[in-house]
Amino acid sequence: KEKLEKYFKLTETALTEVKKNIISGKESNAKEIIDMVGNYISDAHHFENKDDWVNAFAALNYAHGWLDAGARIRLFKVNDSRLFTVDDES
């Protein structure tokens, strides 16, 4: 449960970061990613409330995967390697 709380915080922090850093002209695609992430986080909370830690953790991993994908295809201008699989200053 402690790890789950850690990953909720990490993923929710990353989501907040991408919402503030959408690259101009890519808002529509970014919104799709953000919506999917929100859905998976919601699912994770649902599973957590049912004490289904495995599926809660899986949903969080999917959520974060969507964030990383959006960062990699440059929908978001992010460069925090603690939150994303990119660390690009350009």
Language-model regions, residue ranges each:
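Long, charged/polar, soluble alpha-helical segments
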Residues: 1-90
